[in-house]
Each structure stands twice: as structure tokens, then as C-alpha cells.
Swiss-Prot record:
Cofactor(s) needed for function: Fe(2+)
GO biological process, one term: negative regulation of Notch signaling pathway
Description of how the protein assembles with itself and partners: Homodimer; homodimerization is essential for catalytic activity.
Protein name, as recorded: Hypoxia-inducible factor 1-alpha inhibitor
Binding-site residues for Fe cation, renumbered to this chain: H190, D192, H270
Native organism: Danio rerio
JmjC domain span: 133-303
Gene Ontology MF: a single term: zinc ion binding
Length: 344
């Protein structure tokens, strides 16, 4: 796949519902993620190899393609929804339980529980004010939803996705996350420890992925930090003095629209943005635990296996030392001057 200058990647495959002016500009090159029918044998090969692909015709969430804000407001029920509120367009995830390790950490967004109607009011109020404040609903679908949503959910193409899961010996479906965002919202680059089918329902999202072997280009926060698994690099204003390897980053990108399903492999970094001036976006994630570790390990290890090892080392050291802040100095003492230059 040829490298491109980001937005220009889409000239040939442009969907009439959006154009390049709606994409944010970044400094790194990107390649196109293949767009294929789910019946195309190449799609199966990509998923088997844990490489991303956009599937255009799975009908995975077909009954949900009618979902919009009024329909959901009428039918989603009276449960509580997790809504993140941020001062700008970037919603950097953080683990509230890990905040105890970093007393000085100040989250860039806050999470509030509210009814769906309260979220809609808050979103419309924010849109009308035109200020910097933004909201993003991120809620696991649960049994508080109304009957019509349940009927839609049961009508998803479970036959197809269950076969995908079985073929690859993945673990169970852990959750279906409903995401409703304002135009221009950004979820900065991070990776998950689960397999993900990312089903777009309303509006368009640009998804930029990076393979696990670009770990050293993306500088994740330490495992004990609240922003574990998130990149420290600000894509809009990268600090190359602090993060010099980011100059070597190469992304894989696609814009997904209603009915598209993007396979995001486990441990692949992904940066997700709702298009500028593209209206509200609705997405449902299908998250699966990965396949169990094979009894016989094959060498050389794959990049994602090395990421898992690094995570385990950080976790073990944090527990052994009794203080996560001692992990970095100990690793530096171990490596500096010993492993960081060629040994004869």
C-alpha cells in the first residue's frame, strides 16, 4: 500500500457525504485501510493475520441504521448513561482507580452519570453556545434499554459475528459500547487489550491505526498511570524533543460511514475523530477477549506479544517495589549504559 499525505489518501474513494476539508491535518504519513466485502477472501486473511480491514456489507447493525437522537431519546429507556465533558475536542481516557498513584494528575475531562434526555439537552446547549466545551456519551448497552432497542439489538447479524469469534477461537463478547459524539470530537491514540468490531451507525468517523510494532513511536503512559494505554504524543502539536521517534510513525486510515464495520485488532493503536462539520456520530463497539495463549509458543514473538510482556514487567515491578514511581528509575538503572548501545 502506498503512503500518502493523509487527507489526500481519500481522493479516489471519496464518499459524497464528506470531503477532505472535514479531516484534521497531521504531520505523519498514512496508508489506506482496505475496504472489502465481508465475502471477499482477502478480508478473512486480514482478520486472521490481525490486520485492520473495513467491511462494507456485513449488515451487522442493520436494524440500528435508523437510530438517530430523537429515536434513541424515545426508546433507549430511563437508565443512567456515562457522559464525558471536556473543555476542548480531545477526550483522553483515564482510569479513575489509578488516580491514587498520581496525586498531581488532573483529568482533561470529567465523567458524569445522566439520563439520555439530559445528555441530549446538554449536547444541544453546547452546540448552540459554540464554545469549546464538548460532551461524549460512552455507555455499555445494558438491560435498562427500552423494548424497541432490545428488538433492534436482537436483529444484529449475530450469526456472522459469532462465526468470526468461533473461527478465531476468541474469548467471550465482553461488551457493546454505545458512543454518541459531537462533530469534531477526538479520542486520542490508544490501544485496547481486546479484539474490536467497530460498527458505524450514524455520521462519519476517521480512524487512524498504528500497528503494535510502532509502540516506540507512540510513547504510551506508564502502566500505573491513569492514562495507561494512551499515547503521550499530542498529534496536533507533537513535541519531537520529548518524543523523537514519533517522526517515524506511519498510520493506516479509513473514514467509516453508516453500515461500515472496521476490524480493530487487539493491541493496535487507534485514533478516532468524528468529522468536522459532519453532525453527530453514533457507533457501537463489539469487544471480544482474545484467543487463549497457545500451549506452544512460536518464536520470534510477535509485536503484540512483546507489548504484553512489557506490560507484565511494569506491573510486576510496581508490585515488587511497592511504589509505581520507582519502576522508571529501576528500569533506567538496569538498561542505561548496559543495553542501550551495541555490545561486542
Amino acid at each position: 500500500m502506498a503512503e500518502t499525505d493523509g487527507a489526500a489518501a481519500f481522493t479516489e474513494l471519496r464518499d459524497p457525504d464528506w470531503d477532505e476539508s472535514q479531516l484534521r491535518q497531521y504531520t505523519f504519513p498514512t496508508r489506506q485501510i482496505p475496504r472489502l466485502s465481508h465475502t471477499d477472501p482477502r478480508a478473512e486473511v486480514l482478520i486472521n493475520n490481525e490486520e485492520p480491514v473495513v467491511l462494507t456489507d456485513t449488515s451487522l447493525v442493520y436494524p440500528a441504521l435508523k437510530w438517530d437522537i430523537p429515536y434513541l431519546q424515545e426508546n433507549i429507556g430511563n437508565g443512567d448513561f456515562s457522559v464525558y465533558i471536556a473543555e476542548n475536542h480531545k477526550f483522553l481516557y483515564y482510569d479513575e482507580k489509578k488516580m491514587v498513584n498520581f496525586q498531581d494528575f488532573v483529568p482533561k475531562s470529567r465523567r458524569i452519570e445522566m439520563k439520555f434526555s439530559e445528555f441530549v439537552d446538554k449536547m444541544h446547549q453546547t452546540e448552540e453556545q459554540g464554545g469549546k466545551g464538548r460532551v461524549y456519551l460512552q455507555q455499555t448497552l445494558n438491560d435498562t434499554v427500552g423494548r424497541k432497542i432490545v428488538v433492534d439489538f436482537l436483529g444484529f447479524n449475530w450469526n456472522w459475528i459469532n462465526k468470526q469469534q468461533a473461527k478465531r477461537n476468541w474469548g467471550p463478547l465482553t461488551s457493546n459500547l454505545l458512543l454518541i459524539g459531537m462533530e469534531g470530537n477526538v479520542t486520542p491514540a490508544h490501544y485496547d487489550e481486546q479484539q474490536n468490531f467497530f460498527a458505524q451507525i450514524k455520521g462519519h468517523k476517521r480512524c487512524i491505526l498504528f500497528p503494535p510494532d510502532q509502540f516506540d513511536c507512540l510513547y504510551p503512559y506508564p502502566v500505573h498511570h491513569p492514562c495507561d494505554r494512551q499515547s503521550q504524543v499530542d498529534f496536533e502539536n507533537p513535541d519531537y524533543d520529548k518524543f523523537p521517534n514519533f517522526k517515524n510513525a506511519v498510520g493506516y486510515e479509513a473514514v467509516v460511514g453508516p453500515g461500515d464495520v472496521l476490524y480493530i485488532p487487539m493491541y493496535w493503536w487507534h485514533h478516532i475523530e468524528s468529522l468536522l462539520n459532519g453532525g453527530e456520530t453514533i457507533t457501537v463497539n463489539f469487544w471480544y477477549k482474545g484467543a487463549p495463549t497457545p500451549k506452544r509458543i512460536e518464536y520470534p514473538l510477535k509485536a503484540h506479544q512483546k507489548v504484553a510482556i512489557m506490560r507484565n514487567i511494569e506491573k510486576m515491578l510496581g508490585e515488587a517495589l511497592g511504589d509505581p514511581h520507582e519502576v522508571g528509575p529501576l528500569l533506567n538503572m538496569m538498561i542505561k549504559g548496559r543495553y542501550d548501545h551495541g555490545l561486542s
